[in-house]
Amino acid sequence: MPITANTLYRDSFNFFKNQLLSTLTLAVLAALVTTLLGHLFIPDSEQMKLLTEAEFTFATSGKAGIQELVSQMTPEQQSMIMRAGIGTIFSSMIGSVLLVGGVLTLVAAVSAGNRISSLQAIGLSASQLPKLFLLLLICTLLIQFGLMLMLVPGIILSIALALSPVIMTAERRGVFASMKISWKLAFANIRLLVPAILLWLTARLLLVFIIDRLTFIHSEMAGIILGVFNNLISAILLIYLYRLYMLIASPQQKSI
């Protein structure tokens, strides 16, 4: 019997509905971790004042361009910019790793007939989190690089690497082995992956647009709300990808 996208969508949403509390807990936890870690790297009020003064001085000088702005900053200001940038990436990656590891472990356990909580799911995935962090970091850098070149390469890489976290979690594969298998399986089942990835990207863009219009919400609260809903959207995609992989992964494919 052929696999259809409608069947997978229905199955994924049923799972999401039945495990809503656990999935929501993981989404909130990941968003809070991202926010808290982000605050550790955000410059304090005095440092922000220095950065603002540097930006104002640069703007009134009539120059343009990021390189010129950075070159006009003091070493302390450059260090703050670098720290904030690295901190933002690091905190976002940690939140993503907790979400991906927790959701995939939860799906695997429930599919096997075991009942576990969201915290147990994170605990069971702990041994995989370092490798998962490296995998997500590499995939994110590749996809962002593709998006910077042109939009299409980034979308293609998003589709090609979509199954790699599932493969790593389900099969205990290494980073590059998971990426290689994902590449082959993704293009062999592209009709089932493209709609899901495009829906995921569209939903995230719409969410950013909606949250940005809610000006009455404090910026920090808006950031947390955006993170939670983004995580819920990603959780639905992860459930879909796990279900898809379980259906398409034959013993021959697993031995690649």
From Swiss-Prot:
Major localisation: membrane
Subcellular location: Cell inner membrane
Domain of life, per lineage: Bacteria
Membrane-spanning segments: 23-43, 89-109, 132-152, 192-212, 221-241
Cross-referenced HAMAP family: UPF0259
Alphabetical list of InterPro entries matching this protein: UPF0259
UniProtKB keywords: Cell inner membrane, Cell membrane, Membrane, Transmembrane, Transmembrane helix
Annotated GO CC locations: plasma membrane
Similarity field: Belongs to the UPF0259 family.
Mode of membrane association: Multi-pass membrane protein
Identification of the protein by name: UPF0259 membrane protein plu2479
